[in-house]
Amino acid sequence: NDKRTVAIDMKWRSETYYAELLREGEHLQLALYAGLIEQAKGNAPTALGYFILESGALYITAADIFPNAQVRRPPDGVTVATLLGRAQATWTWRKGQLDAGVVEVVPEDPPDEFQGPDGTLPVKGPNGKFDRDHLVLLGGWER
């Protein structure tokens, strides 16, 4: 009678992208889910993962949970707690900028000067189709 909890996010497509998020330790959305599950149940999920609807692929952070899942472990030192801590540090940094009246417009492939203080999430700039679609609605970055 196995009662382990696993947080899985279902995605339509982009199998390689989501597998790499896990491998690179950039799965913030899953970390947020894990934090919420831990608050609600008192225990953190055993593993986190993405199920890709288009291909049926399942990528997960721990072995021996789903027989056909592909394991993608984050780098050593990347945990739910570290991801959430970096998100909190990023929020604090950005909130300080807003309080000071600073709104930073980050270019594609931003230089180091756009990166936050140590302990914050990396600043990557606009991301292809997804961000550009939203930025056009806001009045910029048309091509």
Label every model-predicted segment.
Residues N1-R143:
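RecB-family 4Fe-4S metal-dependent nuclease core
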